[in-house]
Amino acid sequence: MAIVTTDSGLQYEDIKPGTGAEATAGKQVSVHYTGWLQNKDGSAGTKFDSSKDRNDPFGFSLGGGQVIRGWDEGVQGMKVGGVRKLIIPASIGYGARGAGGVIPPNATLIFEVELLGV
């Protein structure tokens, strides 16, 4: 699959296209995800969170600002059953403040997101 780069700097790649309902703005979605800090060479580094490890899917209203902008943008257009890799620059991630002592300031993040339901 090809890596797509959006105007915001988000990069995404569909690892496995879904075949179910499409995630669009305003819909409640349920996902499994794993997040890593990106190493300087672009590879996935330290894993900082995973709903899969907890077996606890995460739900949110897409496009409503409940999550970082990179997620609101990157999950749109996915279809249920699909898996997408998101590379999220700090500008649409946690920015200069970082998050919770786990994500340092200005960190680029890598997420693997599986859309479970819409």
Report the location of each language-model feature.
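Cross-family detector of peptidyl-prolyl cis-trans isomerase
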Residues: 1-118
